């Protein structure tokens, strides 16, 4: 939804999963056979998986800054998009599961310590990269920022021994100032607490 709003696309949002409409209906499974969110229908195009949806939106509706036509420039952005989604996000989600999803009596501090070390190392690399900013790949918001930047809301909202990283903090503040980020990313996850 963040990308859809950044691109200024007219859309109809339908909420599915966790307290919303069921994802195991025939109608939803026709959109996403895995029965998970997200799914996107754009005319005759039906997609699932967030990275595929983001790339489709960027390629179809993005301008040259958001989705470069030059393949080498696009690949440079794609590296950070993939790193953000597959490396950084996955690491932050380990802390999310510990801090939010686990019941307090099921928490092991050693698990948090290990996850925090991993996330800290990755966040330091991201802080260094952002030093070239203000965005992940330069002066303009790109699809890489959406693939990587969304997890910063959880990174900063979770209770863990987070390092002080000035470039990363400025980047997060820049993202928070964007209405599409604050409206679509900065949503409460309180109803997920203590699920395991």
PLM regions and their residue ranges:
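Compositionally biased amphipathic helical and low-complexity segments enriched in hydrophobic
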Residues: 8-10, 166, 193
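Short, solvent-exposed turn/loop segments enriched in Gly/Ser/Thr/Pro and often Arg
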Residues: 17, 143, 188-189
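Terminal-tail/helix-coil boundary detector
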Residues: 181-196
């Amino acid at each position: 939804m963040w990308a859809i709003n950044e691109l200024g696309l007219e859309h109809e949002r339908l909420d599915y999963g966790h307290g919303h409409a069921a994802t195991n209906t025939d109608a939803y499974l026709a959109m996403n056979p895995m029965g998970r969110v997200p799914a996107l229908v754009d005319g005759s195009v039906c997609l699932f998986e967030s990275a595929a949806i983001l790339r489709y939106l960027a390629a179809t509706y993005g301008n040259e800054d958001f989705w470069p036509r030059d393949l080498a420039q696009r690949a440079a952005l794609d590296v950070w998009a993939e790193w953000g989604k597959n490396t950084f996000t996955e690491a932050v989600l380990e802390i999310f599961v510990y801090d939010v999803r686990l019941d307090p009596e099921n928490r092991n501090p050693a698990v948090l310590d290990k996850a925090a070390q991993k996330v800290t190392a990755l966040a330091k690399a991201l802080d260094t990269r952002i030093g070239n900013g203000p965005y992940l790949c330069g002066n303009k918001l790109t699809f890489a920022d959406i693939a990587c930047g969304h997890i910063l809301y959880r990174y900063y909202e979770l209770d863990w021994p987070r390092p002080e990283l000035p470039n990363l903090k400025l980047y997060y503040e820049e993202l928070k100032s964007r209405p599409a980020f604050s409206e679509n990313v900065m949503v409460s996850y309180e109803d997920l607490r203590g699920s395991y």
